[in-house]
Amino acid sequence: MTDQQLLWLLQLSDSNFPSGAFSHSFGFETYMYNEQICDAKTFREALVVYIQTQLTYTDGLACRIAYEQLEANSMEGLQRLNETLFALCLAKETREGTRMIGERLWKLCRDIYGVDELDEIVQTTRSIHPAIVFAAVGRKIGAAKQTTVLTYLFASVQTMVQNAVRGIPLGQTDGQKLLVMAQPYLIHAASIIETLDEEELGAAAVGLEIAQMQHERLPVRLFMS
């Protein structure tokens, strides 16, 4: 990897990158409201489960598949993947939040990195999944597939941790400790993703999906999902 590629990936994975992800907890706020997540320890436990299930088998695997479809120049495969990912989002808030983040990420990356390979999909469906956009950027800048996937995993967890710092709340030092704690799990997840078949896309934690559905009925909310 060149220094320039490294800097591009660091910029893209920065939690301050304005994709809008900071406005979404993707169901974690339901656990916070019910006091199932109330401190660094309980968040750590939930985060590990998230990494080992939904992040690995849905978002992370989707990023790998998207990269491979881009390598094969298969717009049909990307379109099918995009439709499948949104169909897997059972909770309305999560589905809409993912759509908004994906659209914002696509617009930013189109302007910044010149990623125009996804224009046809966006124009046809009016939606694009963030994992697909991330894969497109990784391939555009010449980052290896495995590096792109691992960076996407870290970026996703970094956003969740920063949102937990605000939502629980936690100290900034606790947040950084959680990121260090998560790194071996992310490396392991990336290695698992390399071995998965496309048919395994979509395995998730049922409890988290239910929490995502319940979120829209919370009387007080800090996050949009």
From Swiss-Prot:
Gene Ontology molecular function terms on file: nickel cation binding
InterPro entries: UreF (IPR002639), UreF_sf (IPR038277)
Keyword Oxidoreductase listed: no
Keyword terms, alphabetized: Chaperone, Cytoplasm, Nickel insertion
Keyword Chaperone applies: yes
Subcellular location: Cytoplasm
Short name of any one Pfam family annotated for the protein: UreF
Annotated GO CC locations: cytoplasm
Job of this protein: Required for maturation of urease via the functional incorporation of the urease nickel metallocenter.
Quaternary structure annotation from Swiss-Prot or TrEMBL: UreD, UreF and UreG form a complex that acts as a GTP-hydrolysis-dependent molecular chaperone, activating the urease apoprotein by helping to assemble the nickel containing metallocenter of UreC. The UreE protein probably delivers the nickel.
Protein family: Belongs to the UreF family.
Descriptive protein name: Urease accessory protein UreF
Organism expressing this protein natively: Geobacillus kaustophilus (strain HTA426)
